[in-house]
């Protein structure tokens, strides 16, 4: 429900910006800004504050290369303690995702808002530490006992692809609020023996068929470099 409210909030901003733009006079030739937009996923620090055992930061950036096409990149790190039915483990590592966005939103004169679809290639290097596990033993003769191995698996890696849907709305001059949702599919992963990578930095939780999902909420600033005629 909280995520739905945030999504409605972003859509409202986009609609308000469109309404204001309708009052402007159109001209035959207009110039649009091309530049570097950098920002942060502000949900990461918020989750780190609210959820014990979770730390993370993600920086985002994109560059407008053609009228409706943007080269995009996200990079970050995560340090997360996960608790499953029979185990407790820590995942710590960094990641980078790079790709392209296509803006399908037709802006009014002077607007640079986006409703986009995109693709990403993701890569992560990380360590896993098995903090504890409880053998799955059922019956009246054996009582499950928690084992504390503290075994660390180093130099693990993962490669994956993403399909991304999102939006960005200019709320103040060159300042943008954004939201995106991504469907992820694992391509390959280096795993320790007898221990599956159930969580990967940048990919998040690994579900059945090596799929995953992600969302981010961003605040970014556009640094104009050049202006080109539309």
Predicted regions and their residues:
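Short glycine/proline- and aromatic-enriched beta-strand/turn motifs that initiate or cap beta-hairpins
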Residues: 21-64, 74, 220-230
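Short loop/turn motifs that connect adjacent beta-strands in outer-membrane beta-barrel proteins
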Residues: 23-34, 68, 106-114, 171-177, ...
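Residues that define the transmembrane beta-barrel architecture of outer-membrane proteins
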Residues: 34, 53-57, 92-96, 113, ...
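Membrane-embedded beta-strand positions of outer-membrane beta-barrel proteins
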Residues: 38-40, 61, 73, 98-100, ...
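Transmembrane beta-strands of outer-membrane beta-barrel pores
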Residues: 42-46, 75-81, 102-104, 121-127, ...
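Extracellular/periplasm-exposed beta-strand and loop segments of Gram-negative cell-envelope proteins
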Residues: 48, 76, 80-93, 126-137, ...
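Glycine- and aromatic-enriched membrane insertion/assembly motifs of diderm outer-membrane
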Residues: 49-109
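Outer-membrane beta-barrel "beta-signal"
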Residues: 97, 101, 209-230
């Amino acid at each position: 429900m909280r995520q739905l409210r945030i999504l409605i909030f972003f859509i409202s901003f986009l609609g308000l910006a469109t309404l204001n733009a309708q009052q402007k006079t159109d001209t035959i030739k207009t110039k649009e800004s091309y530049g570097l937009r950098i920002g942060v996923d502000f949900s990461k620090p918020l989750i780190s504050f609210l959820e014990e055992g979770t730390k993370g930061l993600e920086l985002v950036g994109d560059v407008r290369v053609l009228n409706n096409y943007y080269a995009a990149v996200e990079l970050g790190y995560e340090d997360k303690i996960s608790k499953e039915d029979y185990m407790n483990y820590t995942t710590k590592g960094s990641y980078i995702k790079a790709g392209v966005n296509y803006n399908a939103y037709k802006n009014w004169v002077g607007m640079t808002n986006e409703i986009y679809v995109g693709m990403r290639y993701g890569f992560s290097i990380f360590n896993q530490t098995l903090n504890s596990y409880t053998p799955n033993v059922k019956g009246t003769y054996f009582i499950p006992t928690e084992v504390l191995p503290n075994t660390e698996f180093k130099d693990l890696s993962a490669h994956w692809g993403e399909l991304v849907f999102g939006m960005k709305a200019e709320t103040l001059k060159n300042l943008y609020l954004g939201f995106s949702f991504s469907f992820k599919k694992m391509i390959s992963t280096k795993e320790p023996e007898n221990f599956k990578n159930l969580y990967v930095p940048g990919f998040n939780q690994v579900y059945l068929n090596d799929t995953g999902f992600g969302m981010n909420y961003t605040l970014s600033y556009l640094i104009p470099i050049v202006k080109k005629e539309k």
